[in-house]
């Protein structure tokens, strides 16, 4: 593992209250508690055109669905196309191919949004030559044969699109977005105004597509001056409105966000005119993590910050909710409910969304100094008689679900894990489904854009499998150990994903499992000691042994800390072994204590360069004598470019028997080897300088367990132990959300005496 960002301790600020526990109750129409659970995750690179490389950037951003709810259509700006997916079976999404915009226009045309109207999908296309020459169109495509039947010029650069319930009007936000690198006169780089001003384009859907008519709703006066309603509302730079997101109410009114202007506009779509304007306001938010310092510490605050809302949705015909992502001046890390009659705030989530991310291990600490979790998407819908709001976090890779039966007082229901950068949130109430499309795609980092489906109706939420209480920030659960004498207590330790090292106590008797304590690793003077701790062993006599991976071979070591977390001793690798390692060294440690003393067993992740190819090492260290004894471990092979096979964890199974995790470095649909093997140690120690290769025995193929979550299959299966209850537990390292979805899988596989026979 390479050097990563640096975590850890949540201090005095309380996490979200009882209403924002990681799971809550939501009653369906018949009073039964219902939850959404994931059914399938589909990487959209699998739906790419023939001839495109598997590594080409392919994304799913905004999506829509046909009237029967069985075909999903999404925008792929990176590929300059739209994609089609068969979701008739929510447990198995199928690709139906794509339609390239190159076939309809220019190579550089980019789709920005889509919506379905009857038998047609309307695709909003950005055709701008530059920021100062914005242009766009909407293509009307017959879904049955994917033929364009009409193209309507929009007169500017479009963003979002929405259709009203009766399919009488379509609204398109014409943003004419700013150039973040341009500096207007008297302003700073990226500031407004940057002309031309944006507006709203309304389509009246009378008759068929050939007779649809467009009507521009201007957001400035004909001479370019600001509308009085905008200045009266106190909007930022009202001479340059930049529409972001549009949404229709059930009764046909249109709500529009002006993100950079920090405003909300209501429009009478039938009359093509503005009916109300109000500011999104400013907020002071306390109890959040505001420093990118590798420490999860929600004691910071942002003061008097504009909300700068992105997505907007109607909770009913009176209230709207906004996801306050922020742009260049603001962002308040939550979502807000506004009363459209008065323009006043009725409810605000405050710090609870960010604290939720911390609680379930999805806090992206690297974004703390910017806009935090960045709530970007928001959608609302009624399922089985219950109204819900769905709020997506772009940076922490989740969607929070709320019961909005009382729209002025939303109640948190659950959190849904997503893949990286959830952009589109699409409720499909007719089929009890929610679809989320995530836009981040980087094949070189193993991060791929995907569409995920969730279905309502489960009695219990499947996520999270582990969470924290008592103000504890956590992540990178790449090590596990049972605590001697405690039937339901495990420990883990954080690695170099954070700037300080914490030993985490886990109560495995609960569902989800609960992290109940964090112990800081320090030196004798009480100063935090940062370690890339990849393995942990809880000693019967108290204290812990840590396996610490070094940036170079000689920096690998076993570290003894006492029960207070104070470092007592360091044991380096033997010089000859260290010389043959690079960055991937110690990965796991376990031990036995008997009449012969304490003996540590440690695994290194990759082969030592002087050893036979395909043979890894397991070492035994006699704490009393300081002697190392080494055994060879035969690794599986891989033919995948850039892949490798290595060891990630070790635990004692019984007298002379060890269990180890062997895994590849692949994730998602490419993951193949996530296994636990056992090895029997010889009764006689090998001769010094030799490396006898042990015979391994398959015990558990963990890959099906990882795939059973129906999400993105995690790469880093790194934690394993036998708990005091006799069960085998495993965990995945979420890499502190660095090139990872951030989801932690924590599972009980079954009884050790059955798995490790």
Language-model segment annotations:
Residues 28-757:
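Sequence/structural signature of beta-propeller domains
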